[in-house]
Every structure is written in C-alpha cells, then in structure tokens.
Design a protein with these regions (language model features):
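Helix N-cap/capping motif at the beta->alpha junctions
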Residues: 32-41, 62
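Two-component/phosphorelay signaling modules centered on CheY-like receiver
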Residues: 13-31
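A Lys-centered signature of the CheY-like receiver
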Residues: 111
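Short amphipathic alpha-helix used as the core "switch/output" element in two-component signaling
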Residues: 41, 63-76
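Receiver (REC) domain active-site loop signature in two-component systems and cognate sites
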Residues: 57
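Alpha4 helix (beta4-alpha4-beta5 surface) of REC/receiver domains from two-component response regulators
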Residues: 64, 87-107, 116, 120
Length: 134
C-alpha cells in the first residue's frame, strides 16, 4: 500500500520536526514547508493527500493558503487541518475556527496540541476523503 503524503506547513521548527517524526512513525510520507508561500508551492508540486497548516506564518498566512487551495479545482479536494495558538494575533479559539470554516478548512486544532490528537485527526480526515466512515 502506498504511503499517504502529508504536507506540514508551519514556521515553528521544533513543532515541525516533532510532528514530522511522529507522522513518519505512523508510516506517512511527510514534506515540510516553513511558510505559507513555500507551502502553496509544495502543495502544487507534491500533491499531498492532506495538508496540516499553521495559521500564523510569515509571507502568507494559513488562511490565505487554505483559501487559495480550496478555490482551485485541482487542489480543492485536499483535506486541510488548521493549527494555531490563541494569543495576541488570534483573539479566541472560536474566532480561528469560524475563519477556518469560512475558507472551507476541514478541521481545526488549537495549539498546544497533544501529538496523538494530530494523528487521530489526520487519520479521520484521510478516511473521510477516501469515502470511508469516520
């Protein structure tokens, strides 16, 4: 069975490395991008099965990346899991979730996040995208 490709887009190097290792231990093929622009380019070249996307990043934020992908007929089907920390730039978790729903993100997790929650959400989104029951 072919490994599912996951694109992980986050500017936090420690989080990215830990999450990449976790997902690879679950037999996913993980590609990393460190900002929104790089993430958008890699989404086009890698054609991942799922994208994990941080909201607050330099160059282009996660909302912008998600909106561009979801409105593109070639990439709009790819499930997107948004991640973000609530803080000065993000007033509340519900605000982030509402924004994500407006741009058609498939799921949302506030940071800090438990590693196993990421795995569970990834597996659920992949099952849904393959037409299986969640």
């Amino acid at each position: 069975m072919e490994k599912k490709k996951i694109l992980l887009v986050d500017d936090d190097a420690d989080f990215t490395e830990a999450t990449k290792l976790l997902l690879e231990s679950r037999h996913y093929d993980v590609t990393v991008a460190n900002d929104g622009k790089e993430g958008l380019k890699k989404a086009h070249t890698e054609e991942p099965s799922l994208i994990i996307l941080d909201v607050m990043m330099p160059e282009m934020d996660g909302y912008q990346v998600c909106a561009k992908l979801k409105t593109d007929p070639k990439y709009g089907h790819i499930p997107i899991l948004l991640l973000t920390a609530v803080g000065e730039a993000i007033p509340t978790s519900s605000y982030t979730k509402e924004m994500g729903m407006r741009i058609e993100a498939d799921d949302y997790i506030p940071k800090p996040v438990e590693p196993l929650e990421i795995v569970e959400r990834v597996e659920k989104l992949l099952r849904i995208s393959m037409g299986k029951n969640p």
